[in-house]
Amino acid sequence: QDAAKGEAVFKQCMTCHRADKNMVGPALAGVVGRKAGTAPGFSYSPLNHHSGEAGLVWTQENIITYLADPNAFLKKFLTDKGHADQAVGATKMTFKLANEQQRKDVVAYLATLK
């Protein structure tokens, strides 16, 4: 995982995200280790909100998997936790990052944002 390369990849994310303020997506400073759906002042989709209530924490591994397919990740998480009835709708995040190394690098960068 290379945080410097991840910072370059993160430029794609800046359409919707910033480190220090909510935009279309939530602020990402401190996201690693944060409970899903809890960035202050951000209005989350029900899918994200329910995932946080069901115990989803944004570990580096979870974010790497999430970035490949956000909706599929959250729906699987809720279903695996016995909350299939809440695994409906969609997250606001429609972007998918297919390249696994880029996902690892961007998460390494996110981990530096405090």
Curated annotation (Swiss-Prot):
What are the record keywords, sorted? Answer: Electron transport, Heme, Iron, Metal-binding, Periplasm, Photosynthesis, Pyrrolidone carboxylic acid, Transport
A UniProt-annotated Pfam family: Cytochrom_C
Localization (cell): Periplasm
Report a single Gene Ontology molecular function: heme binding
Q: Which GO terms describe its biological process?
A: photosynthesis
PTM text: Binds 1 heme c group covalently per subunit.
Binding residues for heme c: C13, C16, H17, M93
Q: Where mainly found? A: periplasm
Pyrrolidone carboxylic acid, modified sites = Q1
Name a GO CC annotation attached to this entry: periplasmic space
Stated role: Cytochrome c2 is found mainly in purple, non-sulfur, photosynthetic bacteria where it functions as the electron donor to the oxidized bacteriochlorophyll in the photophosphorylation pathway. However, it may also have a role in the respiratory chain and is found in some non-photosynthetic bacteria.
Q: Which family does it belong to?
A: Belongs to the cytochrome c family.
Tell me the protein's name. Answer: Cytochrome c2
